Design a protein with these regions (language model features):
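Membrane-proximal helix-turn-helix segments that form the acceptor-binding/catalytic region
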Residues: 107-127
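A structural motif in glycosyltransferase catalytic domains
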Residues: 5-8, 12, 173, 188-191
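Conserved donor-binding/catalytic core segment of Leloir-type glycosyltransferases
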Residues: 167-183, 189-192
């Protein structure tokens, strides 16, 4: 979600119709620097463990959002604040990533993420997905019942990464990514081999 937020926050800040607030833990502040001057940053003490972070996300964020009069709480992390009905969530991480992972801790993590995502879908005001696949795969068969609450918002490609029309293409593909299963690099290699 960090890369996504670093790219979307300046765009949202440029929209004069929005009053943008960013809730960050102290240990996240440096990651998001520089923050657009039109964004109000709310700093919270860093949490010592994942349970503390989850408690902060689920309790402190909706309380603070209510206090500042926020109309919407946006979460780019598949799930939102379950205690709030003001959520807009972004579905982007496929649960299929855990299939090839033998670690019990990862299975538990992804299972809990699945439960949180399901509950968030039931509570969210709006559900955004990065692709048709993400919408189908991450809504547990509910996509067809969500109607206008669900919307696919394709990320797109920055024009800097599109060749000029007059450039002759060479026969190679440059892929810049980490090796997470959801990147589907194995199938890309098979497709071009």
């Amino acid at each position: 979600g960090v890369t996504y937020l670093r790219n979307i926050v300046p765009r949202l800040a440029a929209d004069s119709r929005l009053e943008l607030h960013l809730f960050l833990l102290e240990d996240q502040i440096e990651t998001f620097q520089p923050v657009d001057r039109r964004v109000r940053v709310h700093r919270f003490p860093a949490r010592q463990n994942m349970l503390g972070t989850i408690a902060w996300e689920q309790a402190a964020i909706p309380c603070r959002a209510r206090k500042i009069g926020a109309d919407v709480i946006f979460s780019p992390a598949n799930f939102g604040c379950l205690l709030s009905g003001r959520n807009v969530i972004l579905l982007r991480n496929a649960f299929a990533v855990v299939r090839g992972d033998p670690r019990a801790g990862r299975w538990f993590y992804w299972s809990m993420l699945g439960v949180a995502t399901f509950l968030s879908i039931l509570r969210a005001r709006k559900i955004l997905a990065v692709s048709d696949y993400a919408l189908r795969a991450l809504t547990f068969g509910l996509a067809r019942f969500l109607g206008r609450r669900a919307l696919v918002v394709h990320h797109g490609v920055d024009p800097r990464f599109s060749p000029d029309a007059g450039v002759i293409r060479e026969k190679f593909i440059l892929v810049v990514a980490d090796l997470y299963v959801q990147k589907n690099l194995l199938n890309l290699i098979r497709a071009v081999a």
